[in-house]
Amino acid sequence: MSQEFDYIIIGAGSAGNVLATRLTEDADVSVLLLEAGGPDYRFDFRTQMPAALAFPLQGRRYNWAYETDPEPYMNNRRMECGRGKGLGGSSLINGMCYIRGNALDFDGWAKEPGLEDWSYLDCLPYFRKAETRDIGPNDYHGGDGPVSVTTPKAGNNPLFHAMVEAGVQAGYPRTDDLNGYQQEGFGPMDRTVTPEGRRAATGRGYLDQARGRPNLTIVTHALSDRILFSGKRAIGVSYLVGNGDNPVTAHARREVLVCSGAIASPQLLQRSGVGPAALLRDLDIPVVHDLPGVGANLQDHLELYLQYACKQPVSIYPATKWWNQPAIGAQWLFLGKGLGASNQFEAGGFIRTREAFEWPNIQFHFLPVAINYNGSKGVQEHGFQAHMGSMRSPSRGRIHLKSRDPRQHPSILFNYMSHEQDWQEFRDGIRLTREIMNQPALDPYRGRELSPGVSVQSDAELDEFIRNHAETAFHPSCSCKMGSDDMAVVDGQGRVHGMEGLRVVDASIMPLIITGNLNATTIMMAEKIADRIRGRQPLPRSTAKYYVAGDAPVRGNPVRA
């Protein structure tokens, strides 16, 4: 069987759902949205309750659960690489931190030939267009967009306030909005949660607007096998439904839009014959277009947890016990309030570790419990932790297809920690985190250091801890980068170089990873490119002011050295 649409979107994630919603605002445009995962089950607390964020990472229903090849600089560990599966993509299983990146990230992109319109002031209107912030709009925030953003409220956990205060006492700036005028410093962290306390994935915020439109067709459990071409023009998609092996063909009159994420987008392009010719020939894949950058330039954020015992019973450790969870769940389900309605990442910060960095190179997430991101290895006592990670590692990895079978995962190698700068940043980061945690604001709460532990002090000891314990922050990106150099895959509008009717729109097209979590920026990029696809005028540039550190010192004098 075959069907025909104006546009076919492959992947209903943070970007694909934006494109599906915006393109079908034009009633004369037909769109097919293909998603390999299932629906956004609204009664499944695992994806709807913010505090349950660890659960989707533990199974396979919502998580592709990729693994890396042995990482050579990480004691050859095979490392987790979770990616979302289902309507919403990774916005269905992420930590819900609403962080956009630093203004200078985007100004850096705009210095690349062909990317001049990706400056911060060009991007800010699209961040605002996507957002509804619960305390109202301003120059930096939107008031009527599809993404619900919730700010921390008075009366939340005292550890959040103590950790921010400790950062300020350590000599770093205070900022009231990590997405506003000044990212650098410590302050409250916004989250993608609805006013009713539900996860604000793009399947909810965007697709709910568009589902009823007659010009949008959504097919779930549809695994795209390959893109179909006539010469250099993309003309359709062959996909498999459920566990079946009989391909279904859909044709695109205008364009095929690949929104499968930083792992699956290059994998799909390579499987379709677009990528490094030698790799494709090794797998007997006919080369449609030799494009060496497909799957190259892969980047991610790596992070560590620094954990402390808590002397007062104020952490959320009791909430990790099964006997307390029914009451928490009921309060969330019926009232949309309480511990269940928060992702518990309500404070954080960004700092520069050395004068050489023009903008922050380390991010902190503060958490009022001592536990792994995926819910494992919880410390069996009251505790708290800082997630600390470097933001713009010089290490580069790659995605290589291993098979023509669309159900087989690709070979993934990030080359984490492959540069001396990586080691320097993490050593600096651990030592500076300890200084922050040692400030007077945390005196009422801070018990012994649980991890790494006070015995871990020398460079060699820190390096061994990093090798064994650093984990992904789940931010793969840049594997189909925008630009005009020989390794660029797409131009500044997501159009694949050397091809017609084919775009990539997702985190894979970032030329360089940003300073912060990726979801908000991925949504912004899709909003921006949607206007290009529709032939609309770009939104007017913002005139908002933003902070540039310039000659400002990295930090002031700490209260306690």
Swiss-Prot record:
Return the EC number. 1.1.99.1, 1.2.1.8
Q: Which family does it belong to?
A: Belongs to the GMC oxidoreductase family.
Q: From the UniProt record, which GO molecular function terms apply? A: betaine-aldehyde dehydrogenase (NAD+) activity; choline dehydrogenase activity; flavin adenine dinucleotide binding
| Entry function | Involved in the biosynthesis of the osmoprotectant glycine betaine. Catalyzes the oxidation of choline to betaine aldehyde and betaine aldehyde to glycine betaine at the same rate.
Q: In which pathway does it act?
A: Amine and polyamine biosynthesis; betaine biosynthesis via choline pathway; betaine aldehyde from choline (cytochrome c reductase route): step 1/1
* GO cellular component labels: membrane
Name of the featured protein: Oxygen-dependent choline dehydrogenase
Q: Does the keyword S-adenosyl-L-methionine apply?
A: no
Kindly list the residue ranges recorded as spanning the membrane: none
Organism, by scientific name, is Pseudomonas aeruginosa (strain ATCC 15692 / DSM 22644 / CIP 104116 / JCM 14847 / LMG 12228 / 1C / PRS 101 / PAO1)
Is Acetylation tagged as a keyword? no
Q: Name one Pfam family in it.
A: GMC_oxred_C
Q: Which UniProt keywords apply?
A: FAD, Flavoprotein, NAD, Oxidoreductase
The residues forming a coiled coil are none
The GO biological-process annotations, alphabetized, read as: glycine betaine biosynthetic process from choline
Cofactor names from the entry are:
FAD
What S-S linkages are listed for this chain? none
Residue numbers annotated as active site: 475 (proton acceptor)
Q: What's the catalysed reaction?
A: choline + A = betaine aldehyde + AH2; betaine aldehyde + NAD(+) + H2O = glycine betaine + NADH + 2 H(+)
Xref: PROSITE patterns? GMC_OXRED_1 (PS00623), GMC_OXRED_2 (PS00624)
Check the record and name the InterPro entries matching this protein.
BetA, FAD/NAD-bd_sf, GMC_OxRdtase, GMC_OxRdtase_N, GMC_OxRtase_C
